[in-house]
Structure formats: C-alpha cells, structure tokens
Amino acid sequence: MTETILAAQIEVGEHHTATWLGMTVNTDTVLSTAIAGLIVIALAFYLRAKVTSTDVPGGVQLFFEAITIQMRNQVESAIGMRIAPFVLPLAVTIFVFILISNWLAVLPVQYTDKHGHTTELLKSAAADINYVLALALFVFVCYHTAGIWRRGIVGHPIKLLKGHVTLLAPINLVEEVAKPISLSLRLFGNIFAGGILVALIALFPPYIMWAPNAIWKAFDLFVGAIQAFIFALLTILYFSQAMELEEEHH
C-alpha cells in the first residue's frame, strides 16, 4: 500500500503545456531547447571571433583544428570509411547541442507555482520524445539528402536497398526505417530513466536526500555526455554509409 502511494506521487514525463496557433506545445522543452540553441550560437560566435583571419593561425584555431583532425582520423579508422568534410562539424554541433540541453537539467533552478508545487524550471529536452524524434528525423533527412547528392536520385535508393546482397533488400529497408527510431529512443530512454531516478530520490527523507541526489546529478553529467557522443557518432556513421561508393571500400 505504501509503495502504491509513493508511486502515485512520482510525476515523470509531465510537461508544462500551452496552446500556440492551435497547437499544444511543451513549453519546458521549448525553453530548454531555446536556451541550449542560444548557448551553441553564442559559443560559435565566440570561437569564430578567436579564429584569426590572417595567414598566421592563433592558438584557439590550432587547438580546434588539431581536435577536429584527430577526431576525424579516429572515427575513420574505427568505421573504415572516409568522412565528408561537412559531416564532422555537423556532428560536433549536434553533440554540443544535445550535451548542453542535457546538462541544463542539472542546474538547481526551480520555481513554485500558485498551488505551492515546486518544479524544475529547466528540464532535459531529451526527456521529451518529440525533441529526440525531431533530432533523429533531421539527421535522417540530412544523410539521405547527402546520399542522393553523392550517388544520384536513382543510385542512392538502389544502393540503399540492394546493399552488397540483393536478396537482403527487405531487411535493408526495415533497417533503414528503424534507424531514426532507434536513434531517438536510445537517447530518450536513457534521459527519461534518469528523470525517474531523480523522482524516486525526491521521495527520500530530506535529511538524507542530498547525498544520493548529489551522486546521481554527478553521474547524470556523465550519462548526458555519453548519450550525446553516441548520437553524434551514429550520425557520422549514417552519413558515411549513405555517401559510400563502391570504389571506396578499404
């Protein structure tokens, strides 16, 4: 009976909603996404300002060029494919965007509504299935567009379905449809599970709640970084597969 009462107190997956232009939107997700986007844009302008326009590169430019080259070499050696020049910057941008949106939830920013109920102001956007599906579909459309640009409007679908064995075309089709689903649910599931654990920790007595909460918040930073990295790495892999040509196998 006690477990049932405690379970009923857990509110996970609840979002603050509003109606905009006849559509119901999750305002907490919009807020977290907007803040993360503004931080990414501000960071990009800051780094761009640090990059010199002369022939002599500065320290910041050399640092990020070295990191980019090292990341490209490691990923190419791991997946055995060459990466198009525009893919890595896109993947890094997605990584930073997801990372910041995940880490915003760690900030202790709360507010109390008129009913005296205290809730987190900044929630992880990845705990909203709409957010992760939008990201996954964006990646899905982008790498197929890149594949059509590289292989042609006819060659890309043929290569996509045929693969290396013609008889596996139905399996390849199912695999392709499953990519955005698995990409989104992997991120959503891990972040959503973190929200459940935080809700469970909130049911602890106040005098001991701080300890497990602090430990989990620290671990949550690690989980958010790992999930953002996996999403970005799979983005690179999908782009490489979509743009792969027969003569590039090695």
Curated annotation (Swiss-Prot):
**SUPFAM superfamilies, per database record:** F1F0 ATP synthase subunit A
PANTHER family named among the record's database cross-references: ATP SYNTHASE SUBUNIT A, CHLOROPLASTIC
Q: What else is known?
A: Was identified as a high-confidence drug target.
> Which organism is this entry from?
Mycobacterium tuberculosis (strain ATCC 25618 / H37Rv)
Protein name in UniProt: ATP synthase subunit a
Pfam families given for it? Answer: ATP-synt_A (PF00119)
Q: How does it assemble?
A: F-type ATPases have 2 components, CF(1) - the catalytic core - and CF(0) - the membrane proton channel. CF(1) has five subunits: alpha(3), beta(3), gamma(1), delta(1), epsilon(1). CF(0) has three main subunits: a(1), b(2) and c(9-12). The alpha and beta chains form an alternating ring which encloses part of the gamma chain. CF(1) is attached to CF(0) by a central stalk formed by the gamma and epsilon chains, while a peripheral stalk is formed by the delta and b chains.
* Molecular function in Gene Ontology: proton-transporting ATP synthase activity, rotational mechanism
